[in-house]
């Protein structure tokens, strides 16, 4: 997962100089927490253990909608896509883009718990950028050596802030290990993408960054004992790599099936192919991996350099729909990628596959 949040100069905003008391009215009851100066309401609530609704945590999805009932707040990114249809005159805000100026009362139209049932409570850490390497012409992977170990579930993400760069980026972990002292992330370069441009430059190696997480609920748990369907576009493959690593550690594919569909434009745009081929071998026939090419017709049904990786032509959700016909029994589906791709995959999973919402876990990023 990768998504972008923008922020104005914090020094110019009328922020509180000390912790503010925040009260949140939800369908589950009223909860309270303290918010530090300059901290977003979402991050403050999450690090106190509240299961506030969120997806991207960076302003693009609109899931963390809340209404300010009393008190004064500062909105960091007025033009955030996630707030495009909000009733601003009624006090609607994105928790991930809003900071308290003083004590305030919010209303969140969702069920909220005081502590996550399965996931770790997120926290702030610092980290050092290491092992930056190009995977393709426009995709880079990198590691962040963390100031304190992090427990996370496969499929989760963190938000990263870099020195001197406006805003924050959300990235799904590629690796999986408990009490991780480093995390591996991947980013696809985009036009006017400040963080991506910085990574492709010469100054990122060894730089100090700020990390908040883990976040996200599109997670894998081996004890659910389900077949796995994974559909990813571009850098959305990151979380699927973590799921594969966790599944391999649990020997999940000894008794369960896995189907991975990875969408890229052309054969040359594929990455992690050697890792896929190795996972296929380890699964001994219980894992299928297909590289879907949206702008190129493959010369054959299999990758020429990576045995075990199948090739297909078309949009990844369409390729998955054709390949999965009649094979949706007893599975959980994971989807990650740009919103149009995710929406297309969700339609396929619900209308063709007959899956219930509880059997689908997804991340959208812009």
Swiss-Prot record:
It is found in: Cytoplasm. Residues 20-112 form the 2Fe-2S ferredoxin-type domain. It comes from the Bacteria. The keyword Metal-binding applies. It is an enzyme of class 1 (oxidoreductase). Its cofactor is FAD. CDD domains: fer2, T4MO_e_transfer_like. [2Fe-2S] cluster binds at residues 56, 61, 64, 96. Its main location: cytoplasm. Keywords: 2Fe-2S, Cytoplasm, Iron, Iron-sulfur, Metal-binding, Monooxygenase, NAD, Oxidoreductase. GO terms for cellular component: cytoplasm. MSAMO is inhibited by metal chelators (such as bathophenanthroline, bathocuprione, neocuprione, alpha-alpha-dipyridil and sodium EDTA) and by sodium azide, sodium arsenate and potassium cyanide. The keyword NAD applies. InterPro entries: 2Fe-2S_ferredoxin-like_sf, 2Fe-2S_ferredoxin-type, 2Fe2S_fd_BS, Beta-grasp_dom_sf, Cbr1-like_FAD-bd_dom, FAD-bd_FR_type, FNR_nucleotide-bd, MRET. One of its GO terms (molecular function) is methanesulfonate monooxygenase activity. Residues 122-221 form the FAD-binding FR-type domain. Methanesulfonate monooxygenase (MSAMO) mediates the primary degradation of methanesulfonic acid (MSA) to produce formaldehyd and inorganic sulfite by initial hydroxylation of the carbon atom prior to spontaneous cleavage of the unstable hydroxymethanesulfonic acid. MSAMO has a restricted substrate range that includes only the short-chain aliphatic sulfonates (methane- to butanesulfonate) and excludes all larger molecules, such as arylsulfonates and aromatic sulfonates. All MSAMO components are required for enzyme activity. The MSA monooxygenase system consists of 4 proteins: the 2 subunits of the hydroxylase component (MsmA and MsmB), a ferredoxin (MsmC) and a ferredoxin reductase (MsmD). This is Putative methanesulfonate monooxygenase ferredoxin reductase subunit. The gene is msmD.
């Amino acid at each position: 997962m990768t998504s972008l949040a923008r922020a104005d100069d914090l020094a110019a905003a009328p922020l509180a100089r000390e912790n503010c008391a925040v009260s949140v009215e939800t369908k589950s009851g009223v909860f309270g927490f303290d918010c530090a100066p300059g901290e977003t309401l979402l991050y403050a609530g999450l690090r106190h253990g509240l299961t506030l609704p969120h997806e991207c945590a960076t302003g693009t999805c609109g899931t963390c909608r809340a209404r300010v009932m009393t008190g004064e707040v500062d909105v960091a990114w007025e033009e955030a896509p996630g707030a495009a249809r909000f009733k601003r005159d009624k006090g609607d805000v994105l928790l991930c883009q809003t900071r308290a100026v003083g004590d305030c009362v919010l209303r969140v139209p969702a069920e909220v718990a005081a502590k996550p049932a399965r996931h770790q409570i997120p926290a702030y850490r610092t980290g050092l950028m290491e092992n930056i390497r190009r995977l393709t012409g426009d995709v880079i992977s990198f590691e962040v050596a963390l100031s304190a170990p992090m427990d996370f579930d496969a499929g989760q993400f963190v938000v990263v802030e870099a020195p001197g760069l406006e805003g924050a980026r959300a990235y799904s972990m590629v690796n999986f290990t408990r009490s991780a002292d480093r995390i591996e992330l991947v980013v696809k370069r985009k036009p006017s993408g400040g963080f991506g441009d910085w990574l492709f430059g010469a100054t990122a190696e060894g730089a100090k960054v700020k990390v908040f997480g883990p976040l996200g609920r599109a997670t894998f748990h081996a004890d659910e004992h389900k077949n796995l369907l994974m559909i990813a576009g571009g850098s959305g493959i990151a979380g699927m790599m973590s799921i594969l690593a966790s599944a391999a550690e649990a020997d999940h594919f000894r008794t369960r099936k896995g189907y991975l569909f990875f969408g890229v434009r052309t054969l040359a745009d594929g990455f992690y192919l050697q890792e896929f081929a190795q996972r296929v071998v380890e699964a001994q026939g219980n894992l299928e991996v297909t590289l879907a090419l949206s702008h190129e017709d493959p010369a054959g049904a299999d990758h020429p350099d990576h045995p075990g990786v199948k090739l297909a032509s078309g949009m990844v959700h369409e390729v998955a729909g054709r390949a999965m016909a009649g094979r949706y029994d007893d599975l959980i589906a994971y989807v990650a990628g740009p919103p149009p791709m995710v929406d297309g995959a969700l339609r396929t999973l619900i209308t063709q596959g007959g899956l219930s919402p509880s059997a689908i876990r997804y991340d959208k990023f812009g």
